[in-house]
Amino acid sequence: MRPILLQGHERPLTQLKYNREGDLLFSVARDKTICVWYSHNGERLGTLEGSGGANFSVDADPTTTIVATGSADQTARLWDIKTGKTIHSWNFKTTVKRVEFSPDGTKLIVLSEKMMGYPGGISVFNVKADVNATQETEPIMDIKPEEGADKFSFAVWSYGGKYIITAHADGSLSKYDGATGEFIASTQIHEEKFPITDLQPSPDKTYVITSSKDKTARLTDVDSLKLLKTYKTDTSMNSACITSKKDFVILGGGQDAKDVTTTSSRDGKFEARFYHKIFEDEVGRVKGHFGPLNCVVAHPNGGSYASGGEEGYIRIHHFDPSYFDFTYDVERFAAKE
């Protein structure tokens, strides 16, 4: 499984995102460049220029007509994917840490950071997947954390845009109504005092995976907020994703970036780890990065995955046939019956 190494950023990666078909991979980092890559060979299609600060989030609408980004310049922007030009921007009081289109592409979540005395929160905008359309300037709803809850760290849509699932800095998950923004429920998923470091939905958006500094990744059902599975590791995790074709989850992390100069890559545990989604066993690791993995993302068709590191490199791995042939004995026996 030879990786394709992508060099387009000078600073640590913050998020990777495939479009719905998976032919394009978008990357953002703590620099001003937003890169667009062909996922099958790693060729750079182009860059989106104009951001005024580090970029923390990126997402393409379902038709891959427009792209949304969130940045430290306190803006959320919409871009024309064909020309690379900004077509709209919304200004906020603090850094925009997360953007995500709804499954039908008509709404956009924008999550702003709590800092400098501003509470932050989630704004939901109506958007039009038309580069010539005039976008609405005001959100259709604003969501703030419940009283006593910690700040929002991440937010994703559930299936059909029914819920907005949010992750918090205290290790908890919350659920809000996707149409009204009304609070529904909250639960403690990870250990308290250990922040959630990533939140990604399953391919069908019926459950989510979270990673945390408590050295675990966990699956949670979006309807009940019930904990389904726990994947235990020996180092803090920065990211986790769910593969679509095989029953695996991929975890990425490693020793904190501030400590990496004192350790080798082996001691730092800078590997992508594969766990069986059902049995919770670790089944393999992929090395290559020489710093912590900041983000991992699975290709929509399940044939590859990409990882982004603290060192600024992206690695795309296309799976070998042996990956698809691997099964547990119980899976083989069940298939024969």
UniProtKB/Swiss-Prot annotation:
SMART domains: WD40. The keyword Nucleotide-binding does not apply. Belongs to the eIF-3 subunit I family. It is found in: Cytoplasm. Keywords: Cytoplasm, Initiation factor, Protein biosynthesis, Repeat, WD repeat. PROSITE patterns: WD_REPEATS_1 (PS00678), WD_REPEATS_2 (PS50082), WD_REPEATS_REGION (PS50294). One of its GO terms (biological process) is formation of cytoplasmic translation initiation complex. GO terms for cellular component: eukaryotic 43S preinitiation complex; eukaryotic 48S preinitiation complex; eukaryotic translation initiation factor 3 complex, eIF3e; eukaryotic translation initiation factor 3 complex, eIF3m; nuclear periphery. This is Eukaryotic translation initiation factor 3 subunit I. Component of the eukaryotic translation initiation factor 3 (eIF-3) complex. The lineage of its organism: Eukaryota, Fungi, Dikarya, Ascomycota, Saccharomycotina. Component of the eukaryotic translation initiation factor 3 (eIF-3) complex, which is involved in protein synthesis of a specialized repertoire of mRNAs and, together with other initiation factors, stimulates binding of mRNA and methionyl-tRNAi to the 40S ribosome. The eIF-3 complex specifically targets and initiates translation of a subset of mRNAs involved in cell proliferation. GO terms for molecular function: RNA binding; translation initiation factor activity. WD repeats lie at residues 8-49, 51-89, 147-186, 191-232, 288-327.
